[in-house]
Amino acid sequence: MFSAKEKIEEEVTYDEKGQVKERKFTLKGKLEGEYTSYYGNGQIMAHLYFRNGGREGDAVSYYRDGQIREKAAFRNDKLDGDYVSYYENGQQREIEHYNDGKLDGRYTLFFTTGQTREIENFKDGKLDGDYICYYKNGQVKEKGRFVNDKRDGEYIAYYKNGRIREKATFKNGKLEGKFLSFDIDDPANRDNGPEEEPTTLADEDNLRETGKMVDDLFRNLANFEKEQKGK
């Protein structure tokens, strides 16, 4: 038997128009059980579960029109298992796998058309293994390999027409030999198609972060630290 202070309590908050904004349950001031947040139009924004203040089990977030935005699973308040995000048109955006909160295994990023944009491999949260990026026309944009989050082996970047743009070899993150760059001003390397993001080694990290920028409602839909303290 729970004492009065140990009973699970339901809390519902409303927006200025009287629509339900958030429905949650707490036990001893910590989130416990089902949690649901809503858009102003009544559609569910996110639906997940808590145990002792931490996220636990399956979780789903949605766009305002009801389309699924993200699907994931949590264990001990950390992402664990498959994570899939979607564009508003319903196409998959990202497919990832987590182990105890860290990326592990293959990461795949797609264009809105459903074509593959990027494939990477992770181990214990670090880049480890081959990776490859594509232009929208299907041409390889860049490829290489990482070992323990450091470049290792051959790196090649291409123009959209398939000609080599950059080429280099790395060992344990350090350049070995010359870094070769082939000028776009060479008529053979020009392409009259629409411009896309440049592919250079210097831009690579920013491109990777941009490609993975998903509005992760699972991380930002509430201040969980405050919730756990019962504020």
Residue ranges of predicted features:
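Periodic aromatic/glycine/histidine/acidic cluster detector
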Residues: 1-134, 139-157, 163-231
